[in-house]
Amino acid sequence: MIKQRTIKKEVKARGIGIHSGSVVNMTLIPAKEDHGVVFRRMDVGDKLVRAHSAFVNEVVLSTGLENKGVKVSTVEHLMSAFSALGIDNVLVELDSFEVPIMDGSSAPFIFLVQSAGIEEQSTHKKFFVIKDTIRVENGDSWAQVSKYEGFKVSLEIDFDHKKVKESGEKLSINFSKQSYLKEISRARTFGYMKDVEMMQRQNLALGASMDNAIALSDDDVLNEDGMRYQNEFVKHKILDIVGDLYLLGSNLIGHYEGYKTGHLLNDQLLSTILAKPDTWSIETFEEDNSPIQFYSEDWQNSL
């Protein structure tokens, strides 16, 4: 059978919070079967927040969670890494309200999980299987999921910027055949430097810098080291989508398609999916009857 996964040992990391600009300490701790991904805020009495769509409260520029007044911001890159490596059960301790931004991609979190090691557990892994097409729209933006044997993301973005358009704004990734670790994990978040400077004057985005984002001028990329991928912009948006989808609580089996999507539309899609239980099912699989194994290479090489 395909089994649930946790990490083998506790592992720690430290980084800057994108909102506060302060140092955030994070610890990943192994968890038992069916525990799920849960955040624990050590700075507010060890309060817990489950990583699930039901607790999403923030969708502007990033995805944040809240439970009984306790918030955890900017979870999408960490959730994307957990999804890519099939981590079902882990406790994430934080001493702040936000996950550290690290370098603006999910690669540091992938490295962190791999450093801890991955432990297969004794219980069947649960998959979120899409059985019908579910679509949401907001203006000319739209997102949908449909039935698919495996996991695939097809996305088109539309940014009025020379470098973004030159890089390629359309991409489809079939994760049964293409490696998340190689093709997606190193893609960084991006934005206009003038917008960051304006927000910082308002005491916002205090941790944002060229160390954790691709900074854009009106017509160029300002980072001295340039781009990590030729089409890094659309790849980062796919990284975000993988993280947002993992807030369904299980790895998705289906095809996500979108145009000009963001965290808001992803949240609307997840809420719509969960409100239509006849369009999906939670399933377990034996090795020989599973759908085309998404993340197959990444999962096997990570054990």
From Swiss-Prot:
User: E.C. number, please?
Assistant: 3.5.1.108
Q: What does this protein do?
A: Catalyzes the hydrolysis of UDP-3-O-myristoyl-N-acetylglucosamine to form UDP-3-O-myristoylglucosamine and acetate, the committed step in lipid A biosynthesis.
Output a single Gene Ontology CC term carried by this record.
membrane
In the UniProt entry, which residues are flagged as the active site? H263 (proton donor)
**Top-level taxon of the source organism:** Bacteria
Keywords from the named record: Hydrolase, Lipid A biosynthesis, Lipid biosynthesis, Lipid metabolism, Metal-binding, Zinc
Give the reaction(s) catalysed. a UDP-3-O-[(3R)-3-hydroxyacyl]-N-acetyl-alpha-D-glucosamine + H2O = a UDP-3-O-[(3R)-3-hydroxyacyl]-alpha-D-glucosamine + acetate
Q: Which gene produces this protein?
A: lpxC
Disulfide-bonded cysteine pairs: these are none
Its protein name is: UDP-3-O-acyl-N-acetylglucosamine deacetylase
Pathway(s) annotated for this protein in UniProt? Glycolipid biosynthesis; lipid IV(A) biosynthesis; lipid IV(A) from (3R)-3-hydroxytetradecanoyl-[acyl-carrier-protein] and UDP-N-acetyl-alpha-D-glucosamine: step 2/6
User: What NCBIfam families would the database entry show?
Assistant: lpxC (TIGR00325)
The keyword Lipid biosynthesis is assigned to this record: yes
One GO MF term on file is: UDP-3-O-acyl-N-acetylglucosamine deacetylase activity
Question: Top-level EC class, please?
Answer: hydrolase
Instruction: Say which family it is in.
Output: Belongs to the LpxC family.
Q: Which GO terms describe its biological process?
A: lipid A biosynthetic process
Q: Does the keyword Hydrolase apply?
A: yes
Q: Where does Zn(2+) bind?
A: H77, H236, D240
What is the organism field in this record?
Answer: Vesicomyosocius okutanii subsp. Calyptogena okutanii (strain HA)
UniProt cofactor(s)? Zn(2+)
